[in-house]
Amino acid sequence: MAMWRSSDSMVYLPPPSVAKVVNTDDYVTRTGIYYYAGSSRLLTVGHPYFKVGMNGGRKQDIPKVSAYQYRVFRVTLPDPNKFSIPDASLYNPETQRLVWACVGVEVGRGQPLGVGISGHPLYNRQDDTENSPFSSTTNKDSRDNVSVDYKQTQLCIIGCVPAIGEHWGKGKACKPNNVSTGDCPPLELVNTPIEDGDMIDTGYGAMDFGALQETKSEVPLDICQSICKYPDYLQMSADVYGDSMFFCLRREQLFARHFWNRGGMVGDAIPAQLYIKGTDIRANPGSSVYCPSPSGSMVTSDSQLFNKPYWLHKAQGHNNGICWHNQLFLTVVDTTRSTNFTLSTSIESSIPSTYDPSKFKEYTRHVEEYDLQFIFQLCTVTLTTDVMSYIHTMNSSILDNWNFAVAPPPSASLVDTYRYLQSAAITCQKDAPAPEKKDPYDGLKFWNVDLREKFSLELDQFPLGRKFLLQARVRRRPTIGPRKRPAASTSSSSATKHKRKRVSK
């Protein structure tokens, strides 16, 4: 007897439809109007290793300024919808809005090339594991005064939101009751925005040294209590809308100069099957926690990423250079100009004629010099229903800045309305104050650069503007002096040639 039964195979339903992310070129129309904008000379001076507090309260503290810090410039642009446009018929303010598109950038760097070093007067360095005749097994204080030259890094990231950094921090154990004092803490990958003044990866890794190294002597002074961040290129490249990184330039260089091991008790003992026990001084193996000293090697002008223009034709993400909210975030690192100045002053009113180190004070300072130049293209956005719906899904605050708002749903409740609003017989009828617009990056540190009054249409009056006109093959018209008249056109027909007649004598 035949019996029907359902199939044992699984039935797979199609996945739900996902909203498609489109490129900004699909709904942003570019015009032929370009503007130049540039900052003034940007300078900063400070101590390269730590912040110096000033006693008395009259003077401000000396900030920490190091070549191994991120410089994150928050560039503020004027609102193009409130801008003086040369062509009034360029767009319709009732159905369109204007936005800026960054098409060119040049980051200028002053100061000569140089190598700066950092160090620690009590660096945890036990043995020279490269050339040591034997390993020390004592747990005495073997810290030494050591200095290193960090990894060489050049970096430039541009976007309309801050760049994202990653580092390893102290995680939370699943069973905290089973964690004993002295156990290795769990690690957790943390993503945070890169702020101005954050330390870069110097060759010791991207991690929270203050939380994971309690000896305060495993790394140099400037990072022993800091968080070193590394740009999360994977996350920024996978950004849905492509706002965090239009494009990036980077160059890293590193090699290991010296090889040491760490002092202290080894937390993870070497398994016995990995070695044969020795005798005498080899009876107990030394520390197996090894570490190199990083070095960035030679600095040369042949490998410079700065002081040259870059043109953005196609971004790596869906945002092709559109500056939403009229702002840009420029993240810069340049360790090829990391020279630290050494200053010396006499503690006496007159400089001693004989050198005595106890009569002089030594100081160290680091200086940085920047110059930012941009080329912006004026663009229009036609406010159709689909475009406004897409922008509202992407970032609703963009429409708020354009004075568009979503109508609230109708209220089913009855609203009370008093007749005499100023009467003392009723409660106060003052309207609630309108909520202030909150900065989404409030609490984050950036180097603010205001370009709202530094836009110009005269591109040929500025260095980057002339470079842009050259690469765009735009011929500049003369503004003064006589202009050459066009040459008269010549007839294609050739002049009639007269034949010579041969006359017989």
Curated annotation (Swiss-Prot):
Keyword S-adenosyl-L-methionine in annotation: no
Top-rank lineage group of the source organism: Viruses
GO molecular function, one term: structural molecule activity
Keywords: Capsid protein, Disulfide bond, Host nucleus, Host-virus interaction, Late protein, T=7 icosahedral capsid protein, Viral attachment to host cell, Viral penetration into host cytoplasm, Virion, Virus endocytosis by host, Virus entry into host cell
Subcellular location: Virion; Host nucleus
GO biological process, one term: virion attachment to host cell
GO cellular component: host cell nucleus; T=7 icosahedral viral capsid
SUPFAM superfamilies the record matches: Group I dsDNA viruses
Keyword Disulfide bond on entry: yes
Bias (Basic residues): 475-486, 496-505
Major localization class: virion
Name of a matching Pfam family: Late_protein_L1
UniProt-annotated stretches for the region Disordered: 118-143, 475-505
Function in brief: Forms an icosahedral capsid with a T=7 symmetry and a 50 nm diameter. The capsid is composed of 72 pentamers linked to each other by disulfide bonds and associated with L2 proteins. Binds to heparan sulfate proteoglycans on cell surface of basal layer keratinocytes to provide initial virion attachment. This binding mediates a conformational change in the virus capsid that facilitates efficient infection. The virion enters the host cell via endocytosis. During virus trafficking, L1 protein dissociates from the viral DNA and the genomic DNA is released to the host nucleus.
Binding partners and assembly: Self-assembles into homopentamers. The capsid has an icosahedral symmetry and consists of 72 capsomers, with each capsomer being a pentamer of L1. Interacts with the minor capsid protein L2; this interaction is necessary for viral genome encapsidation. Interacts with protein E2; this interaction enhances E2-dependent replication and transcription activation.
Similarity comment text for this entry: Belongs to the papillomaviridae L1 protein family.
HAMAP family: PPV_L1 (MF_04002)
Protein name: Major capsid protein L1
Species of the source: Human papillomavirus 39
